[in-house]
Amino acid sequence: MIKILCSADWHIILHKKKVPYDWQVNRFREMFRKLIALEQSCDVHIIAGDIFDKKPEPDEICLFLSYINSVTIPTYIIPGNHEATKKGESFFEYFTQENAIKNENVHVYTRNGRASVGEANFCFFPYGEMQNNNLPQYVGGDILVTHIRGEVPPHVSPEYDFSRLAPWRLCLLGDLHFNHRYGDTDCYYPGSPLNTTFDRDANRQYGVDI
């Protein structure tokens, strides 16, 4: 059986006001060290969007590349809403250009697509495709990877009809920052591995999924 490492919502940002720069860099580097350690016992790493908090600065890109060019297992990335430039588009398109990422283990999907790792088949449904209502066709046995905001009562409403994802036996999602199964669906959020601008809730779990 394949072992999947799933993370999302890193929100790399290095220029928050009144926060020491070195501290901001070092917490991401520590996260990268832990991810590299975790991948040693996994077969594939799925990153379900929002790696960056906004359009990145050069040092934020370099920090990301320092990790992504070091991964040792197949790693698949889709963009999330924080990487969108306009409806249906993402600045992650630039990372798909030749030599942008030099690690052959890394694959970026800014459009719908499929990939196989061992006996597992993945279907990628990036945020921009969700915005354009371009749900991919279901293929039996696929694991869906997407980035969609679900409901968090009483103030956060879902941005998509989750019943449309029902054919997939497993859905790995980014967007919501706490680790949980979404209702009675087969959709799972790993949550954000690091604190963001949102406060932590002591009654919820955070991190990554394996």
Task: Please name every model-derived segment.
Residues 1-63, 67, 135-141:
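N-terminal active-site segment of His-dependent metallophosphoesterases
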Residues 5, 46, 76-78, 109, ...:
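Hydrophobic/aromatic beta-strand patches that form the interior of the parallel beta-sheet core
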Residues 16-18, 49-67, 84-103, 156-161, ...:
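Metal-dependent catalytic neighborhoods of phosphoester/phosphodiester hydrolases
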Residues 13-19, 33, 64-69, 74-75, ...:
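Catalytic phosphate/metal-binding cores of nucleic-acid and nucleotide-processing enzymes, i.e., regions
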Residues 8-15, 42-59, 74-87, 142, ...:
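Active-site neighborhood of divalent metal-dependent phosphoester/pyrophosphate hydrolases
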Residues 1-2, 27-29, 34-39, 128-132, ...:
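A structural signal for the main folded, soluble domain(s) of proteins
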Residues 83-164, 186, 190-194:
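Conserved catalytic scaffold of divalent metal-dependent phosphoesterases
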Residues 151-210:
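Conserved beta-sheet core of the metallophosphoesterase superfamily
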